[in-house]
Amino acid sequence: MATLLSARRASWRDYLELTKPKVVVLMLITSLAGMFLATRAGVSWSVLLFGNLGIGLCAGGAAVVNHVVDRRIDALMARTHKRPLAQGRVEPLPALLFALALALLGMALLLAFTNALTAWLTLASLLGYAVLYTGFLKRATPQNIVIGGLAGAAPPLLGWVAVSGHVSAEPLLLVLIIFAWTPPHFWALAIHRKEEYAKADIPMLPVTHGERYTKLHILLYTLILLAVSLLPYAIHMSGPLYLACALVLGLRFLQWAWVLYRGSRPHAAIGTFKYSIAYLFALFIALLLDHYLLLNL
């Protein structure tokens, strides 16, 4: 009876929320960048449309699994307690079937409109996030988002391979940028939500090692990110426009990390977290703009 009542309360908006659409959109921006950077010619409309749709569907499926596995944790945290599974508006079994349908459709589109390598790399990313990170690493180690961050860093590689059909050094550099970005992004949020993570018994770095230690590591990773973000220019993958944008964006990120480390602002942690999202969005847009500027010179 409870299942029936929950099912009646569920709406299409609940299922959409399970896919973490804002996160998927950011991932698809990096996937688009990978696609366009992979070629000096245009990207075919079928790869552009169905390739990104396939990647997005698989990412959404992984997000749904994350909701299912974390539903009890989500119910304990103020940030997540209104999620559909945490509130019982969607039951676990229908959610898992929805995740499976998304993943199967996404894989089918990738196999039909891109290539097998893209499909299998996407599947590996999906399993890395949904199974390795969500099912094990998140509860096992304070380095959870460092190790598990590789799965979330894959979209530019997936976009590149969808167009080129092979893996090369350039898309791996884009993966490295997101990989270096992930720790300061999530640890800033973890500082802001430290008490909630402790209540849910999630070993995030601020919970296990304290805020000062975490702030130092945010600062160090932000320095690494700044250096890594300049590599596309160093290997002639991008030009002066990207270099200028990467420096401005990276130095601003470093300023946020320094303010957080010094403890001079009461809301520096959430400010750093929010800026990190804008940073990644703007950095990959700069990559795209610079790419087409170079093509038209």
From Swiss-Prot:
Membrane topology note: Multi-pass membrane protein
Domain of life from the UniProt record: Bacteria
Catalytic activity: heme b + (2E,6E)-farnesyl diphosphate + H2O = Fe(II)-heme o + diphosphate
EC number: 2.5.1.141
Parts of the chain that traverse the membrane: 23-43, 45-65, 93-113, 117-137, 145-165, 171-191, 216-236, 241-261, 277-297
UniProt main location, coarse: membrane
Alphabetical keyword list: Cell inner membrane, Cell membrane, Heme biosynthesis, Membrane, Transferase, Transmembrane, Transmembrane helix
Top EC class of this enzyme: transferase
Biological processes per GO annotation: heme O biosynthetic process
GO cellular component assignments: plasma membrane
GO molecular function: protoheme IX farnesyltransferase activity
Location of the protein in the cell: Cell inner membrane
Pathway annotation from the record: Porphyrin-containing compound metabolism; heme O biosynthesis; heme O from protoheme: step 1/1
PANTHER family, per database record: 4-HYDROXYBENZOATE SOLANESYLTRANSFERASE, PROTOHEME IX FARNESYLTRANSFERASE, MITOCHONDRIAL
Additional free-text comment from the UniProt record: Carbon 2 of the heme B porphyrin ring is defined according to the Fischer nomenclature.
Function: Converts heme B (protoheme IX) to heme O by substitution of the vinyl group on carbon 2 of heme B porphyrin ring with a hydroxyethyl farnesyl side group.
Family membership: Belongs to the UbiA prenyltransferase family. Protoheme IX farnesyltransferase subfamily.
The protein, known as: Protoheme IX farnesyltransferase 1
